[in-house]
Structures are given as C-alpha cells and as structure tokens.
Amino acid sequence: TKNLIISAHYDSAEDSVGANDNGSGVAAVLELARILKDTEIPYNIKFILFSGEEKYMLGSRWYVGKLTEDERKQIIGVINIDTIAEKSDLGYMAMIEGNKRPDNAEYDDEGLKKLAELNKNSMSELFTPSDRFFLTMATNSDHYPFALVNIPAVSIVQDWQDGLNVNDSSDVKENMDIQRI
C-alpha cells in the first residue's frame, strides 16, 4: 500500500516557547487528521510529529534512516508543515520548500492559480493572485531527509521574508493569527 506522510516538528529552539515554530504546524497536522479521518483515499496517510528538527532534523533523519528500501518505495510523498501562523498585514503567503528549484522563477503566480483552482472552496479564499507564493529550495526542515533519499518531499512554510517571530522569546501565541492554521 502506498503512503503519503503529513508531518510537523513539535520541538522548539532553546529560548523559545515554540507557539508558531512549530505549534502551528502541529495544530495543522492534527486538524488535517481530524478532517481526513473518514475520507476514502486510495493510499494511506501517515500523520507524523517529529522531534529534533531544531537540532538538524534528528527525528526525521532517524525515521528515514530506519526505513527499508521497500518502505521508501511505498512513500508517494511527504508534506511537512512548519511555522504557518504569524500575524501579518501582508496577507496570506506560502513558501513551498522542496529539494529542487524550479527553472521558471522565484515567484510562481501560475502555481498559485493552479492551487486556487484545485480547491475553490477554501484555498482560493486564502491565496489570491495579489498574494505571494514561493517555490524555493531548502534544506532546513523535516522534508529534507526524505528528499535526500529521493522521496518527493516539500515543506509548507509562511513567507520568511515577513520577519517572523521565531526561535526566541517572541514566538508566543500573542504574535500568532490562529485563523491561518
């Protein structure tokens, strides 16, 4: 049976409460599990919460290292959710981090339009053509250990150019917009 992994990390930096990085990702994974629990899908969904992301992805690296070659082949992809609920006046912005940079451009309005088209009931309300949608290469979250062994993997992250309050004492619920989750 094929598997899709939806993940987040539950640890935080040493001097941080971790409300947004990554309590928001954990909340999103739990909410997705609740929403999808009775949905018929032609593959399994594994909801995984990793520890050690702030220490060079120790949890996800360990998990990937324990997978057999056959288990790796059964994974159709990984969607990791990391830091998505910072308050912002700039609208909703998403940065999709993967292991390969697209050849087209850093800003991909066509990709945004395709996402909105796929889910008109909710996604189009969150992401509009005036918002920014990034596709970028990144090696700093729990998708990366999967990508290193050629498992398709991405992280969904709020736009880091927005000046996020993370990895310090400002990463508290008062600086979050819970509706973004």
Place the predicted regions along the sequence by residue.
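Short acidic/His/Gly/Ser-rich catalytic and metal-binding motifs that mark active-site loops
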Residues: A13-D15, K87-L90, G163-N167
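Alpha-helical metal-binding/catalytic segments enriched in His/Glu/Asp
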Residues: I6-Y56
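His/Asp/Glu-rich mid-to-C-terminal helical/loop segments that flank catalytic regions of hydrolases
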Residues: W160-I181
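Conserved beta-strand elements of the Class I
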Residues: L4-I5, G77
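Residue-level preference for long, well-ordered alpha-helices that form the structural scaffold
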Residues: G18-D21, G25, G52, N104, ...
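Metal-dependent peptidase/peptidase-like ectodomains
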Residues: G52-S155, W160
